[in-house]
Amino acid sequence: MSPERARQGTTALHDGGPAAGAGTTEQTPPAGRPGAPVPSVLSLPAPAVLAALESSPRGLTAAEAAARRARHGPNELPAASHGHVWRRLLAQFTDLFAVVLLVSSAITFLAYWLERPREPATLQLAVAILGVVLLNAAIGFAQEYSAERTAESLQAMVPHICRVLRDGERRELSARDLVPGDVVVLEAGDAVPADCRLVEAQEAAVNNAALTGESDPVTRIAEPVPPGPPLEARNCVFMGTDLVAGTGKAVVLATGTATEFGRIFRLTAAAPRQRTPLQRQVAVMARRVAGVALATGALLFAVRVPSGQPFVDTFVFALGVMVALVPEGLPATLSVSLAIGVRRMARRQALVKQLLAVEALGSTSVICTDKTGTLTQAEMTVVQLWADGVPHAVSGVGYAPDGEVADPAPVRELLRTAALCSNARLVRTAGRDAWRVLGDTTEGALLVAAVKAGLDPAEEESRAPRVAEYPFDSERKLMSTVHRDGDGTYFACAKGAPLELLTRCEAVDRGDGRKPLTDAGRRGVIAAADGMAGRGLRVLAVARRQVSGPRPPISDVESELTLLGLAGMYDPPRPEVRDAVDACRRAGIRIVMVTGDHPLTAEAVARRVGIVRETAPAVATGTELDAMDDSGLDALLTGARELLLCRVTPEHKMRVVTALQRRGEVVAVTGDGANDAPALKHADIGVAMGASGTDVAREAAVMVLLDDSFASITTAVGLGRSVYRNIRKFLIYLFSHNIAELVPILAATFTGFPLVPITAVQILAIDLGSDVLPALALGAEPMEPDVMTSPPRPRRERLFSTAVMGRILFLGGIQALGVCAVFFWHVHASGIPYADFTRDTPVYREAITMVQAGIVVSQFFNALAVRTDRQSVFRAGLLSNPWLLAAGFFGIGLMAAISYAPPLQAVFRTAPLAPADWAVLAAFGALLLAAEELRKWTLRRRSPAPKGGRP
């Protein structure tokens, strides 16, 4: 049998291959894969597995490995493709606003070419519009490119190096050079570089959390096993997982995308990337604004052509109206505002890879969170010991041996025995004041407790070296070791599940000697163990006995034992998580735990962090989800106030996310393993762990938590809500002045005035000069105190809600009335007939200058007014956003330069204003602010402030 055929058969286990069912010895390769049916490698002995893959205990030859490398390709997943740089740059010009402006610029260039004589103002307009598009595209591209580069700096393919047998020699190779048939050497602490079948195993255990979400170590053996689900095959190890205990040799079955990791990668690639709420709202807004602009321009063109105006002039006029209605500064303002949110989140340890995801966080209504590493510290910790009927508290959290054991003398022998009966190692991270465990985390927790009691595990091991080991297995639920004491005698150490170990004990250590274990004593031990388990602790019993020699039968080692006591441990919650969960409740955000762990473990953690408060929360396993149709799942998600989903697969997570989205929820999903990646990509907001997360998870997510803390999500949600509020503020600010630009043009058209009250170049000066900085300052408004006490906004809520449109019309209407008044007052006061006005008439130039200055001054007061929705701006503090004041004064200063500087007067056809003119405009702006304050006061009187929060 060729190795390629063997590989194709064995790597399709999840597709119903050799592990698909009992009694199956052959399989048909999946569609599109070459190869004939092959025997299941799960049920073959090790020599037959090597033979099936045309390998040997000496590994492959270098020549054969090179041939297979050419055939199968590198052992890596395809790099994420963000597209060529130029394509992403061109994508910036596909926005509807950009398309409308590009077309407008092109038509204006054409109009300038057709004009006789050619007007410099027309060319200025065409160039200015094109410049707007280029500026917006540059800002948007720069922000996205910067975020991508930052995210890519986190990527680290693990493992880079592995040990492999080639030509009978052990070599260190890059993991990407592995091929099917290679024999790899694994030791505790190694990351598994490919999907492999073990051919040798000594006390091997793996952590499959990256694939299954289950954080408990799983024993692995080299013996044949019956066909079954691939991830449950006890003689296989998989890419992306870690060997936490023991050693072994394994033959590579699958590499790259043919691995289980690759299967999840393909599932992730097939999952559609959801558009954020803001993307949907901006798209709707762009279509509507573009439609209104085109319709208005066409209407005015149709009205003015019959009046005898030159065709080209009328066409340019209609384009000017369209330009007046399109908020040219909006894309740049939106991009920079979101970028400010990105920077604020990054300072809080949340890296956002896509700008638009910032706002989407603010609309999150459901968070589907995993458990280990996000809610907890992923560091098992012994918190209670029990010996001779007395509990002993253990202080300190995590792997750092900081803390102490209350009254350590009675439990020293318990902890010494537990430390000897362990394969884990406690090491300090180089260059950092941090500790980590190499090996099983449960054994690591016992080592830390031993150090806290004043013991040195390495010294104890040297005093009583191990001479034999009887590994843990799922039937005995025990692990035992034999040691030689300093006087030449031998003793056995055992640890395991309390009930199983208790049946093998005949005595108990009372501190003053070995006493018989009576029925009452057994009941006391069971009660103590049940009490610890009821608190959500994982409980182990520890025992020992004298033995006759270095390698006695296991029946002698694990009988007539003396019970030393119990150890209770747990993975402690992150200290900040409970407050973060409470903040989510106040904000009306529902939290659903979705984990691969056991239901009892999940519920215990959920209670500690405050996710569960009810006596009987709803708990569903992956098997139960499989039995539900969509209506049943909808009923579960709707009816359960507190919900825990346990023992779930990647497919289950995607189905749950889809069901929640179907109900109108905006869903954020957290995860760190490859098994989380499909749901991370399918969610509205995928949140991956930066420190402990896999590359696949980080690539699928749009936000990466650099500190792996759930509390950072809550902070990011608050910042996201603040960003949305700020976006709404500057939208009101920008669109209200569009009304002030459009209404005078309409008024002039329908009253027969031959010229426009404000030119297109003046409009661009306002949109891109005077208005941009105040809009940016509004986008940088600090987070308001009540931002996390309101319910999430509905998924289908329009960006331009009735309330927002009402404020735009209210403020824009006041501005429009004011600038119309000053324009027509100047025109009528001159006594010049409408027909005699030309572009160079001094009164006309003064009038259009008053219109432009009126909009600029009123926008300064408008910016102050929109800072708050209900609260008086005077209560919020006029000086609380100094950037806004500076931006407003800059805009007024720019307007003054346009009015008084001769070069700018020539460009904008303006005239100098008298001090009295400025006073009139300032009074008009103050009137606008007073009117908005009166509106807010009326709103506060009529209705109390809304309050949110879910129970």
Where are the regions a protein language model picked out?
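Conserved cytosolic headpiece of P-type ATPases
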Residues: 1-792, 799-800, 813, 852, ...
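Helix-coil boundary and interhelical linker segments in multi-pass alpha-helical membrane proteins
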Residues: 749-759, 825-847
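Generic alpha-helical transmembrane segments
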Residues: 770, 815, 848-863
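Membrane-water interface at loop-to-transmembrane-helix junctions
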Residues: 794-814, 840-850
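Membrane-helix interface motif
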Residues: 820-834, 900-905
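Active/binding-pocket-proximal capping segment
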Residues: 830-831, 867-871
